[in-house]
Amino acid sequence: MSAEKKQNLQDTFLNSVRKSKTPLTIFLVNGVKLQGVVSWFDNFCVLLRRDGQSQLVYKHAISTIMPAQPVQLYEPSADADD
């Protein structure tokens, strides 16, 4: 796999929940709980949307991200046995 096509787990996860509009609960390092849907992200922040309002959350402030439903990060290959 070439270097420009390789994506890290964080970007793969955030892109997946963004595309599927999966509701998330985000816990910050100070204990604050935020809920919403990811509408955009980059290397430093996440744009969370809820009830027509947007919140820009810096990634260094995030402790945990919990999706409301399971997230499939890859397509299982047809010849995979497990």
Curated annotation (Swiss-Prot):
Keyword set, alphabetical order: RNA-binding, Stress response
Domain Sm: 11-71
Alphabetized CDD domains for the sequence: Hfq
This protein's record includes keyword RNA-binding: yes
Matches recorded under InterPro entries: Hfq, LSM_dom_sf, Sm
PROSITE patterns to which the protein is assigned, alphabetical: SM
Cross-referenced Gene3D superfamilies: 2.30.30.100
A molecular function GO annotation: RNA binding
PANTHER family per the UniProt record, alphabetical: RNA-BINDING PROTEIN HFQ
Family, as annotated: Belongs to the Hfq family.
Matches recorded under HAMAP family: Hfq
UniProt subunit comment: Homohexamer.
Function of the protein: RNA chaperone that binds small regulatory RNA (sRNAs) and mRNAs to facilitate mRNA translational regulation in response to envelope stress, environmental stress and changes in metabolite concentrations. Also binds with high specificity to tRNAs.
Protein name (record): RNA-binding protein Hfq
Lineage: Bacteria, Pseudomonadati, Pseudomonadota, Alphaproteobacteria, Caulobacterales
Name of the coding gene: hfq
